[in-house]
Amino acid sequence: MSDDVDAPDLAVGHLPRRLANRHIQLIAIGGTIGTGLFMGSGRTISHAGPAVLVVYGIVGFFLFFVLRAMGELLLSNLNYKSFVDFAADLLGPGAGFFVGWSYWFAWIITGTAEIVAITGYAKFWWPDLPAWLPALVTVALILAFNLFSVRNFGEIEFWFALIKLVAIVCFILAGAILLATHFVSPQGDPATIENLWNDGGFFATGFAGVVSGFQVATFAFVGVELVGTAAAETANPRRVLPRAINAVPLRISIFYIGALLAILVVVPWRQFASGQSPFVMMFSLAGLAAAASVVNFVVITSAASSVNSGLFSTGRTLFGLADEGSAPSPFRRLNRGGVPGPALLATAALLLTSIPLLYVHGSVIGAFTLLTIVSSLLFMFVWAMIIVSYLVYRRRHQQRHADSIYRMPAGVAMCWAVLAFFAFVIWTLSTERETAIALAWFPLWLAVLAVGWLIIRRRPRHTETYRRFQIEMNRPVDQETVELVGPR
């Protein structure tokens, strides 16, 4: 007998809350730490110099308030499964359509890019390995973990995040030991706190350098909103979600600022090239002969973590879009494990488009690089829509805000400050040729969505589905399910 008959409660139903506190805490860490910290931070240092510490701190500060706004919205109505739901409910079905499909596309591109990267990292150990094999194995394994239970996703992401966490802690400890022992590099450079200002000053690259640092640093935080995507499947979200979000500033201080501070006091900042990993340099200086292999392993797990997060996020996003009538109805179906199986399978198939990219060069790779920058812009678009949703929520649901157990600090005023910061980041993108080209292409995606929305909205079935969606969003919350505390 089919799953539809055997499991009528899951065929078209609600995502079960099976993620425990430890899963959410490590998912939040994994979302905060991207592959860019391990491989791209050298580029950020070469652009901004020691002021990179301030740049990452400012970006993290504003994104923390995006998460606080998202947290208050999700906890104000536990029928919201993600930010796509509250955007559709508060801003209208068009906003849900734009936010959902933008987030879906952003993760498809990001996941594809990470799979291409995994293939490159695998060739570090096995140079003769067929290019298609690591890509196929990665997608197959990640799909297998995600297809049967959300707890499988939580477990694998838990361990991926733990590996990144251990690597960063070891990195910081190595820097502290080298500093305490007055280490001198083979080039004759001593490890000293004075490296932060003794070569051109703290803001050595000037205003232009700091501005270019914002371009790189902002997109290093892609995935920080992942904890909101997992909210619908979190046991006891009223307790777990605030804990995960409130810990973000400390995590940014340790994982980004702490790690970058460790390398800057050991190695003069001008020695970094754009493509150089500070982690490889630090572990090599600390005497770890296998430094490159260790970092390669960490980067592969970090990239696999991103693919895992991408598959999870896109599957849930398609589920939410179908729930409100903005995606084909089969994507609203849950399998026996309580996960959106059809949505996950469709996403996995699209991720396999990474394989042809491994065999092309030239203009196609250039176009793909352009798309990855556009996908980063899409993440910022989603962050901005979270803030806009919060502004509408404050105007429309004053009582909900008054009753909220998790209010956003500084509320409306901070929302406008965050939007002003995003406008500043967009301006910084216009100052570099590569990012300016991506910025110019970005409206094309919005135009494609606009055409899709004009087609979708005319369908009577969409109107009826959205009406049912609104009823669903305003139904009484099942307190027994919400207050369930899963295993730790």
Please annotate each region the language model reported.
Residues 16, 39-134, 138, 248-257, ...:
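Extracellular loop-to-transmembrane helix junctions
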Residues 179, 369, 374-382, 408-488:
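A generic transmembrane alpha-helix motif of multi-pass inner-membrane proteins
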Residues 85-88, 92, 124, 197-200, ...:
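TM-loop-TM module centered on a large, flexible mid-protein loop between adjacent transmembrane helices
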Residues 159-160, 331-341, 380-432:
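C-terminal membrane-solvent junction of multi-pass transporters and transport-like membrane proteins
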Residues 119, 133-191, 245-249, 376-385, ...:
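Membrane-interface loop-to-helix entry segments
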Residues 1-42, 46-51, 64-68, 79-80, ...:
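Membrane-interface "cap" regions at the ends of multi-pass membrane proteins
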Residues 3-15, 52-53, 127-130, 162-297:
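Helix-loop-helix junctions that connect adjacent transmembrane segments
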Residues 2-8, 84-88, 115-135, 167-170, ...:
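Helix-loop-helix connectors at the membrane interface of multi-pass transporters/channels
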